[in-house]
Swiss-Prot record:
Assembly information from the UniProt record: Part of the 50S ribosomal subunit. Contacts protein L32.
InterPro entries xref list: Ribosomal_bL17, Ribosomal_bL17_CS, Ribosomal_bL17_sf
Keywords of the record: Ribonucleoprotein, Ribosomal protein
Organism of this sequence: Mycoplasmopsis agalactiae (strain NCTC 10123 / CIP 59.7 / PG2)
BP-aspect Gene Ontology terms: translation
Lineage: Bacteria, Bacillati, Mycoplasmatota, Mycoplasmoidales, Metamycoplasmataceae
Protein name: Large ribosomal subunit protein bL17
UniProt family annotation: Belongs to the bacterial ribosomal protein bL17 family.
């Protein structure tokens, strides 16, 4: 399979914007449905941010804040950054990587694109 960043045929600004939105929604909801290529690219970004959040220094918090969108989590209207550092990262304290799981789905009916569900383990 080709490099996922080459498949989109879009510029860097568009790709980064889509990844920021998808990562923020994944952390807010726990699972999302997207295309397989986006899910594979999303996994890279999500796992790096969770690894940074496991060591809650000010520098790591600023790195994560610069990437995530200001999305609210429904539970108590917490910000997704606070949710990442207070809830998600401590639950993976003893886990060294492999924080996400990808399930393949049937192809989308309109354009036959391979679909997938990505979720936090």
């Amino acid at each position: 399979m080709a490099n996922p960043t080459q498949i989109y045929s879009r510029d860097v600004k568009w790709r980064k914007g889509v990844m920021r939105t998808l990562v923020s929604e994944l952390f807010a909801n726990g699972r999302i449905t997207t295309t397989l290529t986006r899910a594979k690219e999303l996994r890279r970004h999500a796992e790096k941010l969770i690894t940074k959040a496991k060591n809650p220094t000010l520098a790591n918090r600023r790195i994560c804040a610069s990437f995530l969108r200001p999305t609210l989590v429904e539970e108590g209207k917490k910000d997704v950054l606070k949710h990442l550092f207070d809830t998600i990262a401590p639950s993976y304290a003893k886990r060294n990587g492999g924080y996400t799981r990808i399930y393949k789905l049937v192809n989308r009916q309109g354009d036959n694109a391979p679909m997938a569900i990505i979720e936090l383990v």
